[in-house]
């Protein structure tokens, strides 16, 4: 299975060094969305324009940008 990486981009960037094997791009996007919502919910101060999860493939090509989002009310 191909490996994908889920980097935090924006104000406080963090690089995913381990990555995760996913069956395809859709599964990687779904996992990136999960991460974006989890960070947004646990750290609502991070939800702002310019902060997002950058999903890259094993060749380093960015395939998705997923904005951080909070599910808290």
Where in this protein do the model-derived segments appear?
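Generic recognition of well-ordered secondary-structure surfaces with a strong bias
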Residues: 6, 28, 53-55
């Amino acid at each position: 299975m191909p490996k994908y990486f889920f980097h935090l981009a924006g104000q406080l960037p963090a690089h995913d060094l381990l990555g995760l094997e996913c069956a395809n791009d859709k599964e990687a996007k779904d996992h990136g969305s999960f991460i974006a919502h989890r960070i947004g919910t646990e750290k609502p101060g991070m939800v702002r324009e310019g902060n997002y999860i950058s999903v890259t493939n094993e060749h380093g090509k960015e395939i998705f940008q997923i904005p951080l989002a909070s599910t808290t009310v």
